[in-house]
């Protein structure tokens, strides 16, 4: 699902709210979440999951074209951990 599809779906489910308001709301939610991660804050949405930053150590990588070794700097990357309810919903029963 893309951001546009989410906005369209929410607008259809809530016909009393204009599509523009839904679009602005979704954009603001994502902006606030991005800002929180930028400030190294953890985001927890009960029943859905949590977002946090994971630190990646500096390491030696390899250029796939040339095979040459390349030094990669340390960095923080966003990480999502699914919550219990989300895991249960997507787990298909065999």
From Swiss-Prot:
Signal peptide: none
Pfam family, one: Bac_DNA_binding
InterPro entries: Hist_DNA-bd, Histone-like_DNA-bd_CS, IHF-like_DNA-bd_dom_sf, IHF_beta
PROSITE patterns: HISTONE_LIKE
One cellular-component annotation, GO: chromosome
GO BP of this protein: DNA recombination; regulation of DNA-templated transcription; regulation of translation
Gene3D superfamilies, per database record: IHF-like DNA-binding proteins (4.10.520.10)
Function according to Swiss-Prot or TrEMBL: This protein is one of the two subunits of integration host factor, a specific DNA-binding protein that functions in genetic recombination as well as in transcriptional and translational control.
Quaternary context: Heterodimer of an alpha and a beta chain.
Family: Belongs to the bacterial histone-like protein family.
PANTHER family, alphabetized: DNA-BINDING PROTEIN HU, INTEGRATION HOST FACTOR SUBUNIT BETA
Protein's recorded name: Integration host factor subunit beta
Organism of provenance: Actinobacillus succinogenes (strain ATCC 55618 / DSM 22257 / CCUG 43843 / 130Z)
Lineage, uppermost ranks: Bacteria, Pseudomonadati, Pseudomonadota, Gammaproteobacteria, Pasteurellales
Gene name in the database record: ihfB
């Amino acid at each position: 699902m893309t951001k546009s599809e989410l906005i369209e779906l929410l607008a259809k489910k809530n016909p009393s709210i204009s599509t523009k308001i839904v679009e602005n709301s979704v954009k603001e939610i994502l902006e606030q979440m991005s800002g929180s991660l930028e400030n190294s804050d953890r985001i927890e949405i009960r029943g859905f999951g949590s977002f946090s930053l994971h630190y990646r150590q500096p390491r030696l990588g390899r250029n796939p074209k040339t095979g040459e070794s390349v030094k990669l700097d340390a960095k923080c990357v966003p990480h999502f951990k699914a919550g219990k309810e989300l895991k249960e919903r997507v787990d298909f029963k065999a």
